[in-house]
């Protein structure tokens, strides 16, 4: 059995009380295969609604998706036994929001939406493979480093927000550049770093889910 990190994921739906509370409502046991299958179905639903929104070019779905998704997320966090029913609807609403946001960004930076889709699938698949093959392990040091990097990024964005309020411009390494013009290489490098750190947070979720399967947590 693999040794798991004692640090927990920052996902509020995967807190330390998740399995404890769920055990009161069901005797069915979760499996890694079942979790992956349901995650795949949810991702498929998300992609379908996102594709619909993107092809119809209806940005009004952004507010519907964000508000509806936020409400369902809160319901799922506090009523975890409802997760099998709320998850598909949450995925559909998030797809509406992401599709609308993709329309906005694709109008400013043509082709960026398609790149984001391929990167999302690629990163998720690569990280899942790396975790299962133990190329990446959710150790204590890994968690500490990830928390430090994530916190540093958050502080950088807060500073950038304050600077933009006062000066009307962004920090140089966060400059996107004008539409149609290339962004500074340091900005591109910082963006890649942020994507990598954000993606590595998925490893903590993988570790938490696998631990639940190993201890026979409820479905």
Locate each region found by the language model.
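A hydrophobic alpha-helical transmembrane-helix feature that marks the membrane cores
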Residues: 1-219
């Amino acid at each position: 059995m693999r040794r798991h990190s004692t640090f927990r994921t920052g996902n509020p739906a995967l807190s330390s009380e998740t399995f404890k509370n769920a055990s009161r409502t069901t005797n069915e046991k979760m499996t890694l295969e079942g979790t992956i299958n349901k995650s795949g179905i949810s991702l498929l639903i998300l992609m379908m609604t996102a594709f619909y929104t993107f092809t119809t070019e209806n940005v009004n779905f952004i507010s519907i998706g964000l508000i509806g998704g936020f409400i369902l997320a809160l319901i799922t966090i506090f009523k975890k036994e409802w997760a099998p029913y709320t998850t598909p609807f949450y995925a559909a609403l998030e797809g509406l929001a992401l599709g609308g946001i993709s329309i906005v960004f694709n109008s400013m930076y043509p082709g960026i939406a398609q790149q984001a889709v391929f990167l999302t699938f690629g990163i998720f698949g690569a990280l899942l493979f790396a975790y299962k093959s133990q190329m990446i392990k959710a150790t204590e040091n890994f968690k500490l480093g990830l928390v430090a990097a994530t916190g540093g990024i958050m502080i950088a964005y807060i500073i950038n927000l304050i600077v933009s309020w006062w000066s009307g411009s962004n920090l140089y390494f966060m400059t996107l550049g004008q539409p149609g013009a290339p962004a500074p290489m340091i900005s591109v490098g910082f963006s890649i770093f942020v994507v990598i750190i954000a993606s590595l947070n998925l490893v903590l979720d993988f570790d938490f889910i696998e631990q639940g399967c190993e201890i026979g947590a409820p479905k």
